[in-house]
């Protein structure tokens, strides 16, 4: 049984699919820049959901869009003196690099807004015909007050909003609206902007209608699960519901799941606070992709994730132990990869081990089935890794170390279970780095020398110190010009 917290009902519900194939839509990125830690948090959570559904014998169709026309993309195109399409294409390539590095499965379909203009126009026309939309001088707006259910996802009170927003109709766009809360379905093109032809003239779609059109075209009128960050609940997802359900006359999604936001040292991650972390920066700073993935999964997907040096270091150490266990067959050089048929295993012992491992698999499924409790699932993974790592410590220390067939059976079955369950979490074996014997005091001394070299603009020496520490298994993370932290890898 899988239970999920449904933002729509505000409670945990047992998941019941509509039919044989679970239809999932996830709001994708606006492709104007590199992905950040918030994107990693979101897409890792939904990757675990997808993997767990497949592990639980569900068939899944997973769709995630690209928003490839937007004010931010147009702004970036002007800044770089390239076309909107070039900005989008470049960042879609970088998106795939980041997601692939984190072990995130590629969606079954990744539609782009610009390829769905006809569907978008058709949907807007239906809304006009049904009286939910109106046009004003080349723009088209959704009339929020025509929809009595508006606000059901976010608990927004549009009557109160209307009172609060009275007098804010000064700018040109708002002056065209019947009410301040009405939102754009189609925007009239400005002189210097790319455009698409439509029944209302040259222009481009609003952000919200893009997703409604792509959901309908890719998955149909009603889907099982709609995913996104909690920052999308209002207005984006609220507006999606309003558009789709008004046009189609059916419920858009049965389950709405939203992940929590990312903080850095207790503060909201933002460019203005200069604590903004891209996935690429974090990996280039020495944090391994699987360490990052493991770190994200240590906290329930609905809760805020606080990125701190201490939490990251703890995740790095924990993942290192699991990674060693996943390297079990490599480190034993295949010497334990089979059971000696001439020395049979006690049947009673085999049954005991098989039962114990089946119980761990059951608890693993119960953990993830309890609203994706990845922290509890990881605890089971760690429990499986522990005897493998303990054995390896003895095996590598004692020459000619031998074990009986019972223990060999236990270790091999434990390893197989570990491999299978880590795959559900998307954790994959990474190349092992020899552990360093350098002390924390020595590391601090070298970091201070490097900071001094950087202040003196002696970048060659600074790079030399970074390389020296890297050779000793220490990766430096530059938090700012004055602050450098480190992790063992």
Curated annotation (Swiss-Prot):
UniProtKB keywords: Aminoacyl-tRNA synthetase, ATP-binding, Cytoplasm, Ligase, Metal-binding, Nucleotide-binding, Protein biosynthesis, Zinc
InterPro entries: Cys-tRNA-ligase, Cys-tRNA-synt_Ia_DALR, Cys-tRNA/MSH_ligase, Rossmann-like_a/b/a_fold, tRNA-synt_1_cat_dom, tRNAsynth_Ia_anticodon-bd
Binding locations of ATP: 271
Binding residue positions for Zn(2+): 27, 211, 236, 240
Substrates-to-products reaction catalysed: tRNA(Cys) + L-cysteine + ATP = L-cysteinyl-tRNA(Cys) + AMP + diphosphate
Disulphides: none
EC number: 6.1.1.16
Motif ('HIGH' region) on chain: 29-39
Cofactor(s) of this protein: Zn(2+)
Pfam families on file: DALR_2, tRNA-synt_1e
SUPFAM superfamilies, sorted: Anticodon-binding domain of a subclass of class I aminoacyl-tRNA synthetases, Nucleotidylyl transferase
Subcellular location: Cytoplasm
CDD domains linked to this entry: CysRS_core
GO CC terms in record: cytosol
Record GO terms (molecular function): ATP binding; cysteine-tRNA ligase activity; zinc ion binding
SMART domains, alphabetized: DALR_2 (SM00840)
Gene Ontology biological process terms, A to Z: cysteinyl-tRNA aminoacylation
Source domain of life: Bacteria
Subunit structure: Monomer.
HAMAP family per UniProt: Cys_tRNA_synth
Entry similarity comment: Belongs to the class-I aminoacyl-tRNA synthetase family.
Full protein name: Cysteine--tRNA ligase
Source organism: Prochlorococcus marinus (strain MIT 9301)
């Amino acid at each position: 049984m899988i239970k999920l917290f449904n933002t729509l009902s505000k409670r945990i519900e047992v998941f019941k699919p509509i039919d044989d194939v679970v239809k999932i839509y996830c709001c994708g990125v606006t492709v104007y820049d590199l992905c950040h830690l918030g994107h990693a948090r979101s897409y890792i959570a939904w990757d675990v959901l997808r993997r767990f559904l497949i592990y639980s014998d569900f068939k899944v169709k997973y769709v995630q869009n690209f928003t490839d026309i937007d004010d931010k993309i147009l702004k970036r195109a002007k800044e770089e003196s390239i076309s909107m399409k070039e900005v989008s294409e470049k960042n879609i390539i970088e998106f795939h690099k980041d997601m692939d590095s984190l072990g995130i499965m590629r969606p079954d379909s990744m539609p782009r807004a610009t390829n769905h203009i006809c569907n978008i126009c058709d949907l807007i026309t239906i809304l006009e015909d049904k009286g939910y939309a109106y046009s004003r001088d080349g723009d088209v707006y959704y009339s929020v007050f025509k929809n009595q259910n508006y606000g059901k996802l976010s608990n927004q009170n549009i009557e109160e909003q209307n009172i609060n927003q009275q007098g804010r109709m000064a700018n040109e766009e708002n002056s065209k609206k019947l009410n301040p809360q009405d939102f754009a379905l189609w925007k009239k093109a400005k002189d210097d902007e790319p455009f698409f032809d439509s029944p209302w003239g040259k222009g481009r779609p609003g952000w919200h209608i893009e997703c409604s059109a792509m959901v309908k075209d890719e998955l149909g009128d009603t889907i099982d699960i709609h995913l996104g960050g909690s920052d999308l609940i209002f207005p984006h997802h609220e507006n999606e519901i309003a558009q789709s359900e008004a046009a189609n006359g059916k419920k858009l999604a049965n389950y709405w799941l939203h992940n929590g936001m990312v903080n850095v040292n207790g503060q909201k991650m933002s460019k203005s606070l200069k604590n903004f972390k891209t996935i690429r920066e974090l990996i280039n700073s020495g944090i391994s992709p699987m360490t990052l993935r493991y770190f994200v999964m240590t906290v329930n997907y609905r809760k805020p994730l606080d990125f701190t040096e201490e939490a990251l270091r703890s995740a790095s150490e924990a993942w290192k132990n699991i990674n060693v266990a996943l390297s079990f067959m490599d480190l034993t050089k295949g010497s334990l990869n089979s059971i000696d048929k001439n020395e049979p295993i006690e049947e009673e012992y085999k049954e005991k081990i098989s039962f114990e491992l089946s119980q761990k698999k059951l608890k693993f499924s119960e953990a993830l089935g309890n609203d994706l409790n990845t922290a509890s699932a990881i605890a089971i993974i760690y429990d499986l890794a522990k005897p493998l790592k303990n054995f390896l410590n003895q095996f590598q220390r004692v020459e000619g170390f031998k074990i009986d067939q019972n223990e060999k059976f236990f270790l091999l079955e434990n390893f197989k279970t570990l491999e299978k369950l880590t795959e559900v979490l998307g954790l994959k074996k990474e190349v092992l780095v020899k552990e360093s014997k350098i002390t924390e005091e020595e590391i601090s001394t070298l970091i201070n020398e490097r900071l001094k070299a950087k202040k003196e603009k002696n970048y060659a020496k600074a790079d030399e110190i970074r390389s020296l520490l890297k050779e000793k298994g220490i990766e430096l993370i530059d938090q700012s010009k004055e602050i450098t932290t480190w992790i063992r890898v």
